[in-house]
């Protein structure tokens, strides 16, 4: 198996494919309503909705780094964490879930297109290799999947 295929497998398992580790990011979001997504554990704590948009942003950021893109902006103004919800409607929640899916699909395409010889090269401005960016986005998805699972349990 090539490094690209291994990285894609890790990214997919962390996002929406079955794996030994349990719930992935998409699985943690299955059946979550806009109300559940908006629930906040504390005044200064992030809710599920904010974690979804945050995960979408970092998929976008890593895709940009892999593709060497400059000047393009994320679908939402700002970076890292956005206050959510704005309206709190199911339509708004579904739109942000779709944003996450679109960014995941775009990231997959960027990983597939990335030259295999460059995975071991250092990412510009970063202390780690491109391969670490791809592995990191998978770890990031699983980290937040765990947070989401905990937030759901706290609501019960």
Language-model regions: role of each:
Residues 1-4, 8-22, 26-29, 34-83, ...:
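Short, contiguous alpha-helical
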Residues 83-121, 132-137:
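Acidic/histidine-rich alpha-helical segments that form the ligand environment
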